[in-house]
Amino acid sequence: MTNMSQPPATEKKGVSDLLGFKIFGMPLPLYAFALITLLLSHFYNALPTDIVGGFAIMFIIGAIFGEIGKRLPIFNKYIGGAPVMIFLVAAYFVYAGIFTQKEIDAISNVMDKSNFLNLFIAVLITGAILSVNRRLLLKSLLGYIPTILMGIVGASIFGIAIGLVFGIPVDRIMMLYVLPIMGGGNGAGAVPLSEIYHSVTGRSREEYYSTAIAILTIANIFAIVFAAVLDIIGKKHTWLSGEGELVRKASFKVEEDEKTGQITHRETAVGLVLSTTCFLLAYVVAKKILPSIGGVAIHYFAWMVLIVAALNASGLCSPEIKAGAKRLSDFFSKQLLWVLMVGVGVCYTDLQEIINAITFANVVIAAIIVIGAVLGAAIGGWLMGFFPIESAITAGLCMANRGGSGDLEVLSACNRMNLISYAQISSRLGGGIVLVIASIVFGMMI
C-alpha cells in the first residue's frame, strides 16, 4: 500500500538540487549563513572597518552577484559577465545609499588604506612574467612599444575623422577626447594631463579635468564591452587569437622551458615574497632613484614589469619558484577577482559621473576612438609578430581604459588576466608616452 504522506520523488529531487546548488563553491545553506550574518551586521550597523570586515562584505557580495553575472544571458557573453556585474552593482549600492558608511569605510580601507589593488596587480605581474619563456619575453617587450604607438595612431586617425563629422576641430578632438582616453587612466592620465594643459596654456585645469574624466569614463565602458566582443571573435576565428598568449610562437623559434619539479606551499610563498620585493624595489626607483626620465614620470608598476623581466632573464629563479609564483597568481586571479571587483565598484566607480557624461556626441566619439585604438594595435601587433586579438586587448583597450582598475575590468571581461603585465605597460609606460605627446599638442595650441 502506497504511503500517501510521502512526498513525490520529483519534489525530493528539487529540494536536493536546491540544497546542492553552490555559490562561490559553497552549498546554498552555507552561503545563506554568510549572507544572513552580513544582513544582521548591516541592519545593526555593526561592522569592523578593518580588513576583516572589508573582506567579509566583499566576499559575500561578490559571490552572489558574480554567480548572477556569469549566468545572465547576453550580459555574460557581450558585457563582461561576473566581474562587470559585480563592480556595477557595488557602484550602484554606493550611488543608491544601500551601503552604510561603515561598509563603505571597511571596503575603502581594504582598497585604499591596505591597497589590496597594488598587491593584486603585483602578484599577477610577477606570476605572468616569470611564467613566460625568457627569449619570448624579450621579443614581446621589444615589439610592444611600437604596437602601443600604432594603437595611439589608430585612435588619433579615427578620432579626428569622427570629430570632423561632428564639426569639432582637430586640436579639440586630440586635446579633449583622444589624449584623455589613451592617457593611462585617471591618476596617471587625466590628472597629469590637466596639469600639463594648465601649465602650457594657462587655462583652468578643473575645466579640462571635468571634461576629460567624463570622456574617459564612457571609453572605459566601451573598452570592457569590446573586450568581451574580441574574446568571441577570437573563438570564432582562432587564427586571430592566441587564447591568452601574445606572441605568435610560429614566427619565433624558442628553446624548451626547463622541466618543473614538485611544487610545494613554500614555492608559492616565495612567489609572494618576490611579488612584494619587486614591488618595493620598483617603488623606490619610481619615487627616489629615477622619479622621471626626460621630465616624464614613470609609474612604479612600469618599473616593476622591467624588474621582474630582468629577474626572469637572470636565471636566478628555479623552475619550481617560477611555477610557485604562477600558482599564486592563478589563485589571486581566479579566487579573489570577484572580491576585488566589489572594491573597484565602491572606490573607483562613480555612477553619477557616468550618467553626466552620456550625451550622443560623447558616446559616439568615444566608441569610434576606442575602435581606432583596437584596429591600430591589432595591425601593429600582427606586424610585430603578435596575435591581433591579444595585441588589440592589451595595447589597444588597456590604453583606452581607466588605468589599473580598468585593466582588470577589461582583462576579466575577455578571460585574459594572464596578460596583466602587458596591460600595465600600456597603462604606465604607454600613459607616459601620451603625456609627452600631450605637452607637444598643447604647446601647438598656444
Curated annotation (Swiss-Prot):
One of its GO terms (cellular component) is plasma membrane. Keywords: Cell inner membrane, Cell membrane, Citrate utilization, Ion transport, Membrane, Metal-binding, Plasmid, Sodium, Sodium transport, Symport, Transmembrane, Transmembrane helix, Transport. GO terms for biological process: citrate metabolic process; sodium ion transport. It holds the Pfam family 2HCT. InterPro entries: 2-OHcarbox_trans_Prot/Firm (IPR018025), 2-OHcarboxylate_transport (IPR004679). Residues 45-50, 96-115, 167-181, 190-212, 288-299, 352-359, 439-446 are periplasmic. In the absence of Na(+), transport is inhibited by the thiol reagents N-ethylmaleimide (NEM) and the methanethiosulfonate (MTS) derivatives MTSEA, MTSET and MTSES. However, inactivation by NEM, MTSES and MTSET is prevented by the presence of Na(+). In the absence of Na(+), the substrate citrate has no effect on the inactivation by permeable or impermeable thiol reagents. In contrast, when subsaturating concentrations of Na(+) are present, citrate significantly reduces inactivation, suggesting ordered binding of the substrate and co-ion; citrate is bound after Na(+). Na(+) binds at I181, G183, M399, N401. GO terms for molecular function: metal ion binding; organic anion transmembrane transporter activity; symporter activity. Changing C278S: Retains 79% of specific activity, response to various thiol reagents is not affected. Residues 182-189, 399-406 dip into the membrane without crossing it. Residues 1-27, 72-80, 131-136, 234-264, 316-327, 382-398, 407-416 are cytoplasmic. Induction: Induced under anaerobic conditions in the presence of citrate and Na(+). Expression is regulated by the two-component regulatory system CitA/CitB. Is also subject to catabolite repression under anaerobic, fermentative conditions, via the cyclic AMP (cAMP) receptor protein (CRP). Changing C347S: Retains 79% of specific activity, response to various thiol reagents is not affected. It catalyses: citrate(out) + 2 Na(+)(out) = citrate(in) + 2 Na(+)(in). It is found in: Cell inner membrane. The chain crosses the membrane at residues 28-44, 51-71, 81-95, 116-130, 137-166, 213-233, 265-287, 300-315, 328-351, 360-381, 417-438. Its main location: membrane. It is a multi-pass membrane protein. Each monomer has 13 alpha-helical transmembrane segments (TMs). Of the 13 alpha helices, 11 are single membrane-spanning helices and 2 are helical re-entrant loops (or helical hairpins (HP)). The protomer is formed by homologous N-terminal and C-terminal halves with inverted topology, each containing 5 transmembrane helices and 1 helical hairpin. A large cytoplasmic loop connects the N-terminal and C-terminal halves. The N-terminal transmembrane helice (TM 1) is not involved in either of the two halves. Secondary active transporter that catalyzes the uptake of citrate across the membrane with the concomitant uptake of sodium. There are conflicting data regarding exact substrate stoichiometry: the sodium/citrate stoichiometry was predicted to be 1, but the latest studies suggest that CitS transports citrate in symport with 2 sodium ions. Transports citrate as a divalent citrate anion, H-citrate(2-). Shows narrow substrate specificity and is very specific, transporting only citrate and to a low extent citromalate. Allows the cell to use citrate as sole carbon and energy source in anaerobic conditions. Homodimer. This is Citrate/sodium symporter. It comes from Klebsiella pneumoniae. The gene is citS.
